[in-house]
């Protein structure tokens, strides 16, 4: 395909990712290929939005949302009262102030309380028009264009690396760009996942108000998730250092899922003003999460994060670190040691002391801490089975999300026989699901495993990316809305089901190809482009991968689908029937496409309206030669 054809073809195609079970009003509209779909937020983060007040009227009772490196949570939060007192106020907060250069992100007037996170100047709630969900619009403002230029390369490196992160315990980073429209106030804007359930600091304050002690099991589960995220960051090449880990920058969901932000503040923005703020923080004792060597070291190291984690673990265990006396708010070494001594569990004290070792070279790594006697455990067969069920590649590709949920419901009934025991007298005894204690919580347990509440720490986790420099510069917005395209991302989601159709227009004989993709996160994607007799399936597929619409590992599978569609609709006798406008549709499931190297059979059925082609592995055909629709999918014109 020529460049001109590419521009008029897939690069100009209609793209829509929309949730299957969302309200139609939330369905995504068409989006230009210049702003490719980013990985949608995990299902666990799409909670009911909190009550948020404008920053101009925010007080100690306001709740918060967060992006990467943006702290959510303020003291005395009241989750039961709404600060919105009238419909007019709500309409004002929903007013759109500006949009991203690609038009996908819409910044609202509604601001989010960010507390004292270094480097972040302004945080607004925003709408992702493609996914139909709320996100966070973060702004870092620079004193001058010269200052931005001096930090741009370092900023680019950090943000380019953050775009590649994919961990269920790390707040998702979606996009960034620079804006130099106002030379006297240049800025960097980045879009992050919206966390609505508040910070860990908020939760600890509420727990302390209720005079409750945090159970050791909850403490262990939180520490495991935080260390899993830190181990992932530190295992990147080069390593990513958090640099601002506190209980204010750790966020907890309603189901116990913990996430941390991942921006290094000094790499985002550093100026004289930031230095003065840091000195004020030291004066009021807010620096106690920072290691003794912080500021003196030439380069941030993983040991800094380990020290900060130790302070977080101590605050989680004690609920609060009280100052030495009521007249001072400073937290010193004596206060820390007294708080550690107040803990009852010896192993808990040992783990925290190792993290707070004054010598950075003697502190354990995040991975080493996962094997500490207090955190390490031999995973139960129940947990291993749940991970196999949820994350096994075979299970993720064999069924769509809906089919998988239906399969779970089929076997999750009280009268389902789980085991059968033959007794000595020849009698048989059946054990049903209703006989198992805690069976009513099994479905929730599997859901928690899916969302990352129970990671496997004794096995190698998800391999972090090896970062490389990007050839493209970050997007620079010269106006509120610019035609400059953003850097194209690679698609990280896999295809579960796919369908392709071609249709010839009666008046012009132009061939329109439409590709429907169902991704592994319940999202549908529709791609439409014009093709001609010179276009090949290989060229079309390569362009889909290059533009970030298809995962690289799915390239061969979708190429076969396109080849069969073009063959059936254009090169065969069925092309004549196409002129009637009926079209040709080809459908394939990932389960079938995964077996390309095996023995295939292609079932074709042509009628007067058009032709339909479906891929079906032989083992999925029954004795009569019919297709098991539940496994292979359906075909329609």
From Swiss-Prot:
Main location: cytoplasm
Transmembrane stretches, start-end: none
GO molecular function terms listed in the Swiss-Prot or TrEMBL record: ATP binding; protein homodimerization activity
Positions with biased composition (Low complexity): 36-46
Biased composition (Polar residues): 1-14
Biased composition regions of type Acidic residues, renumbered to the chain: 88-98
GO CC list: cell cortex; cytoplasm; cytosol; endomembrane system; Golgi apparatus
Family: Belongs to the protein kinase superfamily. Ser/Thr protein kinase family.
Function field: May play a role in subcellular trafficking between the endoplasmic reticulum and Golgi apparatus.
Name this polypeptide is given: Nuclear receptor-binding protein homolog
Organism field: Drosophila melanogaster
Underlying gene: Madm
């Amino acid at each position: 395909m020529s460049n001109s054809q590419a521009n008029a073809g897939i690069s100009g195609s209609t793209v829509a990712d929309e949730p299957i079970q969302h309200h139609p009003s939330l369905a995504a509209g068409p989006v230009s290929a210049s702003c490719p779909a980013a990985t949608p937020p995990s299902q666990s983060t799409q909670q009911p939005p909190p009550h948020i007040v404008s920053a101009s009227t925010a007080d100690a009772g306001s709740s918060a949302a967060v992006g990467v490196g943006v702290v959510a949570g303020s003291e005395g939060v009241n989750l039961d009262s709404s600060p919105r007192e009238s419909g007019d106020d709500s309409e004002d907060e929903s007013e759109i102030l500006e949009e991203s250069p690609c038009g996908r992100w819409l910044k609202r007037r509604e601001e989010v309380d960010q507390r004292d996170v270094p480097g972040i100047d302004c945080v607004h709630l925003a709408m992702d028009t493609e996914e139909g969900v709320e996100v966070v619009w973060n702004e870092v403002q620079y004193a001058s264009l010269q200052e931005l230029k001096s930090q741009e390369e370092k900023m680019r490196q950090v943000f380019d690396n953050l775009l590649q992160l994919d961990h269920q315990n790390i707040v998702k980073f979606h996009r960034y760009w620079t804006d130099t429209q106002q030379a006297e106030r240049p800025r960097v804007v980045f879009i992050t996942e919206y966390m609505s359930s508040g910070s860990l600091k908020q939760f600890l304050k509420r727990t302390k108000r209720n005079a409750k002690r945090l159970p050791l099991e909850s403490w262990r589960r939180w520490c495991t998730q935080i260390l899993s995220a830190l181990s992932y960051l530190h295992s990147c090449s080069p390593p990513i250092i958090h640099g601002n880990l506190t209980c204010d920058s750790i966020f907890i969901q309603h189901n116990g899922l913990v996430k941390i932000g991942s921006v290094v503040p000094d790499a985002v923005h550093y100026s004289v003003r930031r230095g003065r703020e840091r000195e004020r923080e030291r004066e009021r004792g807010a620096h106690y999460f920072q290691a003794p060597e912080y500021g003196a070291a030439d380069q941030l190291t993983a040991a800094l994060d380990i020290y900060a984690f130790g302070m977080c673990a101590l605050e989680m265990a004690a609920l609060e670190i009280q100052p030495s006396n009521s007249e001072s708010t400073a937290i010193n070494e004596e206060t820390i040691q007294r708080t550690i001594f107040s803990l009852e569990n010896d192993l808990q004290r040992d783990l925290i002391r190792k993290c707070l070792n004054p010598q950075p070279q003697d502190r354990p790594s995040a991975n080493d801490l996962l094997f500490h006697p207090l955190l390490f455990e031999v995973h139960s067969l129940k947990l291993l089975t749940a991970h196999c069920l949820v994350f096994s590649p075979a299970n993720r590709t064999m069924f769509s999300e809906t089919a998988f949920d239906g399969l779970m419901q089929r076997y999750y009934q009280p009268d389902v026989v789980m085991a059968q025991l033959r007794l000595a007298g020849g009698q048989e005894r059946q054990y049903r699901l209703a006989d198992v204690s805690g069976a009513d919580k099994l479905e929730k347990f599997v859901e928690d495993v899916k969302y990352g509440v129970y990671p496997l720490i004794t096995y190698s986790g998800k391999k972090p990316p090896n970062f490389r420099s990007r050839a493209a510069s970050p997007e620079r917005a010269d106006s509120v809305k610019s035609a400059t395209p953003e850097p194209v991302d690679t698609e990280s989601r896999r295809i579960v089901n796919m369908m392709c159709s071609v249709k010839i227009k009666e008046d012009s004989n132009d061939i329109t190809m439409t590709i429907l993709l169902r991704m592994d996160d319940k999202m549908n994607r529709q791609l439409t482009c014009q093709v001609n007799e010179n276009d090949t399936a290989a060229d079309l597929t390569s362009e889909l991968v290059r533009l970030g619409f298809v995962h690289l590992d799915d390239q061969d599978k979708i190429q076969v689908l396109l080849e069969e569609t073009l063959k059936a609709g254009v090169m065969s006798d069925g092309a004549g029937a196409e002129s009637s406008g009926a079209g040709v549709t080809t459908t394939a499931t990932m389960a079938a496409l995964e077996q390309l190297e095996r023995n295939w059979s292609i079932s074709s059925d042509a009628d007067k309206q058009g032709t339909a082609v479906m891929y079906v592995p032989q083992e999925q055909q029954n004795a009569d030669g019919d297709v098991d629709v539940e496994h292979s999918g359906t075909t329609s014109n």
